[in-house]
Amino acid sequence: MAGSAPEGTQFDTRQFDQRLNEVLDGQDEFFTSYDEVHESFDAMGLQENLLRGIYAYGFEKPSAIQQRGIVPFCKGLDVIQQAQSGTGKTATFCSGVLQQLDYALLQCQALVLAPTRELAQQIEKVMRALGDYQGVKVHACVGGTSVREDQRILQAGVHVVVGTPGRVFDMLRRQSLRPDCIKMFVLDEADEMLSRGFKDQIYDIFQLLPPKIQVGVFSATMPPEALEITRKFMSKPVRILVKRDELTLEGIKQFYVNVEKEDWKLETLCDLYETLAITQSVIFVNTRRKVDWLTDKMRSRDHTVSATHGDMDQNTRDIIMREFRSGSSRVLITTDLLARGIDVQQVSLVINFDLPTQPENYLHRIGRSGRFGRKGVAINFVTLDDQRMLFDIQKFYNVVVEELPSNVADLL
């Protein structure tokens, strides 16, 4: 354990379990044994180049788990985060790892274990993207790839290794992966790893790591085996639980349009514009810059649209939102930052010009609170690169997203 928890975060199992039951029965969205909440990435004291990577990746506002989980991890505390996939767990521990690396030392300093090859490669991708401006070197050690290639890359030097337990243990056993400088150890989807029978390998790996190591455990559920791991590996962990949102996708017809390439999205949107203007609609993109770009493109083609994003001052945003709510403006282009703040009850069409960067945000963009349960239509523009995210969204919410029929106007 690289740091000690501040007073008040000491972990009492009985108290936690009792409080957890209250949370699950009650109205609270989350429970944490750590009280700091940071509502923006800028407030977290992160390195400038890490912030650049976070914003370039398309994040604007931290999710509930990121607001509570990034800072304790950055402080070197042991952290247990219990939340469903899609709540932003990956970016939480990636940010915590990237903040603490010594980039001048080209040795493995962080080891992340994941249950599947696909997830390990996905984490590698996120870690590399967020750490792009810091010059991070990341490698995924997974089964089904060349052992010799793994050895060559590890020999050349990396800052972070992400991998599946089998291949990582093999690399440690062969001494191709040297544990001496590893100071952070993360288990992602711990429950899934245990259910796949990786328990012994996880223990074997842990035995080979330095004694003073920071541990992060991320898991959707906490079965007894996972709790046992936290007891054996961790010291006074900070615990954070995030409940699923109470928004619902019920009554919302969800469709996709295959656009193959990014460049084709604009034409597709223009083809749909007449339909958009029949009703009130919101178009979501992933970055502030893209809001401005798309707004200019639409206006240059004589399409009337409003736009709002986080760079605008609050007063301007309020005026634009007032016009939108009153119905004097009918098509709004925006980012995830405002997804939760838009009173979308009167909006019957949402277009995801860009699919969200994490599944959680899909719900905030198109979901409705059950109290109102208004009907609606959501249209997702899907390039070849987006197909995996669309699959993840369907799996996460247990929904089927169908291809857009030609009579879309009749559905509104």
UniProtKB/Swiss-Prot annotation:
Q: What is this protein called?
A: Eukaryotic initiation factor 4A-2
Q: Which residue intervals define the domain Helicase ATP-binding in the entry?
A: 70-240
Subunit-structure text: eIF4F is a multi-subunit complex, the composition of which varies with external and internal environmental conditions. It is composed of at least EIF4A, EIF4E and EIF4G.
Q: What is the lineage of its organism?
A: Eukaryota, Viridiplantae, Streptophyta, Embryophyta, Tracheophyta
Species the sequence originates in: Arabidopsis thaliana
Known catalytic reactions: ATP + H2O = ADP + phosphate + H(+)
Q: Which Pfam families match?
A: DEAD, Helicase_C
Q: What is its EC number?
A: 3.6.4.13
Any idea what job this protein has? ATP-dependent RNA helicase which is a subunit of the eIF4F complex involved in cap recognition and is required for mRNA binding to ribosome. In the current model of translation initiation, eIF4A unwinds RNA secondary structures in the 5'-UTR of mRNAs which is necessary to allow efficient binding of the small ribosomal subunit, and subsequent scanning for the initiator codon.
| Localization | Cytoplasm
| DEAD box, short sequence motif: residues | 188-191
